[in-house]
């Protein structure tokens, strides 16, 4: 699949006048355990700027003040509050887990709680350290849901068993067959590609100026935001355009910047989406 103007406009459409925040999806973001609090903040900033209607963050209690200082638009709670966690999980259209989650006991419990309670009609985006935790589980034990994986090459190696040198298109497609049907894979590298079944979209955007902390967290937030607000659109197309836009904005910023900060990408998302929707 190729990214062109037609595909972009299939996804990023003008908003209906008679709509409200509930029309654009409810999101639960899980992560940001010490010392990785900034990761979930960047994911949340990207998610809100991408247009998700209601964004709630489950994170360390100590991280909530910092989150609200950067993003008062998001709600937040201590991810150790199990009942509140489950209530927000059940209410979400899209769940993102992994940005700054870590791999300690609390992180493992959070992932287990999500996997045990996610429903078949919900989208689950798995990023960062949650991918490493997921790699330790049997694929046959994964829940039935709309699964989106966003690994870099080393994380995909752990998930698929494919060494980086073996991660060809055909090998990656075969490895993806081990996950439930319809799983979407954002295979991040200097040549990022988005897979679903026999489909693959190679993205000819992005560059080394994106090699900085938080870039993947921002992408995961954008993917989550697009899935939430464009729920009536084909999920694969929504993920492709979110991933493309992330790097297209970076390309533009890099014309006058040696390094592109993830937060600069997030700030630019609304204006880019406005222009692309016209």
Report residues per predicted region.
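Small-residue (G/A/S/T)-rich helix-start motifs and N-terminal tracts that mark the onset
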Residues: 1-123, 132-146, 153, 157-278
